[in-house]
């Protein structure tokens, strides 16, 4: 909705390769995924976020939750009903782990500014573990502090620089698929 409003778009029409009005114009395309590593400074922030998340997983396991080593948002979301009905002492670490997972995903995929905006919005809410996360979790607060420093230095996600580099070296038409997140 926000994108449509910003572009002053009133209606959307969905098409794909097999749509009758599109099919005659489909050409062979070359798709290339270009992996982009985070900068060393961003990896430090990422490490602090992962340590904060690991601490929640340790606490949840200590409280009797069976969680795999594969840390995923879906695993945490699936544990909500069990925790709310049968293991209330795990509510705080569970909901905090969910928030950290969201923050980590935003940081890795979208960069520093969306991560900090997410943190600002989350900090202003009320809920299980928010105060602890933003006031006493040394790893999470250190990640925010480092991210603010990087933002002040003009550092964002390295995918933007990589995209610019690729576009300067290509002479053909290019389609860029992007994920937009600011919520």
Question: PLM features: what roles do these ranges have?
Answer:
Residues 24-25, 36:
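Conserved C-terminal "switch" segment of AAA+ ATPases
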Residues 7-10, 29-31:
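Short glycine-/polar-rich loops that comprise or flank the Walker A/P-loop
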Residues 14, 30-36:
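Short amphipathic
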Residues 3, 9-23, 41-183:
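Helicase motor interdomain insertion/brace
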